[in-house]
Amino acid sequence: MASKSSITPLLLAAVLASVFAAATATGQYCYAGMGLPSNPLEGCREYVAQQTCGVTIAGSPVSSEPGDTPKDRCCQELDEAPQHCRCEAVRYFIGRRSHPDWSVLKDLPGCPKEPQRDFAKVLVTPGQCNVLTVHNAPYCLGLDI
């Protein structure tokens, strides 16, 4: 049987390990409303529709001023998301294959959702917003889940 003096350090080590694990997990959430806005990348809808189908969304702000174009607004919103949550923000934006109705994207006249999804997958890349992600590179892996 183990003595009291050997159990105490083991118990202390276990408690410290669980406290450390909980502390490192704090702030790592990437859910809509927790770590991300409730509608992640809502500001990217206009840019994605323009790029994929050449259409504008009724009611969207129209500007060609430097820093206030649809691409600028989209990239700013993506840049404001925590780096470790950017791919998850794109995932929410395009919707999961298992729940396509949960997408921020909408079928528009002359602009189906699928081409918009395909374009939105590259929003983080160097040719678009060029932001670092959880992979510490401007790419998101596994967005077709």
From Swiss-Prot:
CDD domains: AAI_SS (cd00261). Endosperm. SUPFAM superfamilies: Bifunctional inhibitor/lipid-transfer protein/seed storage 2S albumin. Pfam families: Tryp_alpha_amyl (PF00234). Alpha-amylase/trypsin inhibitor. It could be involved in insect defense mechanisms. Heterotetramer of one CMa, one CMb and two CMd chains. This is Alpha-amylase/trypsin inhibitor CMa. It comes from Hordeum vulgare (Barley). The gene is IAT1.
